[in-house]
Swiss-Prot record:
Lineage: Eukaryota, Viridiplantae, Streptophyta, Embryophyta, Tracheophyta
One GO BP: cell wall modification
Signal peptide start and end residues: none
Organism: Triticum aestivum (Wheat)
Listed Pfam families: CASP_dom (PF04535)
Disulfide feature: none
Name assigned to this protein: Casparian strip membrane protein 1
């Protein structure tokens, strides 16, 4: 062999007879790469947290009161609408002796009943229109402007409906009992249907008045708490 030719090196392994040459051991990963792998896995698997603006734990009590306000408005809508319908359909004709000699009792002949029907219809329409605003307060209980607006409107509706219910209640009592000093005889002994409808309308309107009182108190307490 000449000195100019490169020498060929044949590796020799110390293995037992019948076994093949051992495989090469895997190269160890650099420390920086090994440390970066768990960090990357933690970064990809960690859940992302989004800020919850509309649903905060601190607003839980305010949201419950706002939801109660929404339910009370639905509950007040039924009696107000029933009072308006019952008053508007109060009409009865009483025949005496012949068909040509009749007595008639109609709601528009009594200003108090006409006022009750208009007030109940306005209150029912207001309650229906206020439901979307109340729903917004449920979703965003931190808003104070809508609460204050609803409080002012509820107070106005409370005064209007109370006046109509009180005026109609006085006429209903006079129709049932009469007045001996003024020589006013009770008419409910003859006009049973008319008195029944007007009495039911007065009861329904006072029920709506009571719910409006709860709405005003609840709204005032919520604003004071904020």
């Amino acid at each position: 062999m000449s000195t100019s030719e490169a020498a060929t090196v044949i590796p020799v392994y110390d293995v037992a007879p019948g076994q093949g040459a051992p495989s090469k051991a895997p190269a160890a990963a650099p420390p920086s790469a090994a440390a970066a792998a768990p960090a990357a896995a933690a970064t990809t698997t960690a859940p992302r947290k989004f800020p919850m603006r509309f649903f905060r734990r601190s607003d839980r009590g305010s949201r419950c009161m706002a939801f109660l306000d929404f339910l009370l408005r639905i509950a007040a809508f039924g009696p107000a609408l029933a009072a308006a319908i019952a008053t508007g359909t109060s009409d009865e004709t009483l025949s005496v002796f012949t068909e040509f000699f009749q007595f008639r009792a109609r709601f528009d002949e009594f200003p108090a009943f006409l006022f009750l029907m208009v007030a109940s219809a306005i209150a029912a329409g207001y309650l229906l229109l206020s439901l979307p605003f109340s729903a917004v307060v449920v979703l965003r209980p931190q808003t104070t402007v809508l609460r204050l607006l609803l409080l002012v409107c509820d107070t106005i509706m409370l005064g209007l409906l109370t006046a109509g219910a009180a005026a109609a209640a006085a006429i209903v009592d006079l129709a049932h009992s009469g007045n001996e000093r003024a020589n006013w005889v009770p008419i409910c002994m003859q006009f049973h249907g008319f008195c029944r409808r007007t009495s039911g309308a007065v009861v329904a309107s006072f029920l709506s008045v009571f719910i409006f009182v709860l709405l005003v108190v609840l709204a005032a307490f919520s604003i004071r708490k904020r």
